[in-house]
């Protein structure tokens, strides 16, 4: 189970795997990372970059397939992810079961939280504690 939190907003999604996607604010290219929920950690399992550019170095060992760089992240398992939500750039998307949704849409009231935070709210993704959901 994946928990999302921002300020007083909480949501739980019945997911054991998901893709986090976003568009680079300068280069306008899509990034995608596949994650698995494993116990109390998030494990990065694969990633794709649809181009390169400023601050977007292609990792060693990446393979180019149909114009997309594919690689396996070397990042260790994480207890959670902190993502900045701003109305000034395209937001993150959470994809599962072949469907993508804006991450902020999964937390109704996110626009108000972002406004109260001066346009720079944080969304936390982490495994839900076992037996506990918001």
Model-predicted regions and their roles:
Residues 1-7:
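Short N-terminal edge-element motif at the start of the domain
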Residues 4, 50-52, 64, 95:
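Generic detector of intrinsically disordered, low-complexity, polar/charged segments
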Residues 7-59:
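N-terminal secretory signal peptides
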Residues 58-134:
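Mature, soluble, non-transmembrane domains
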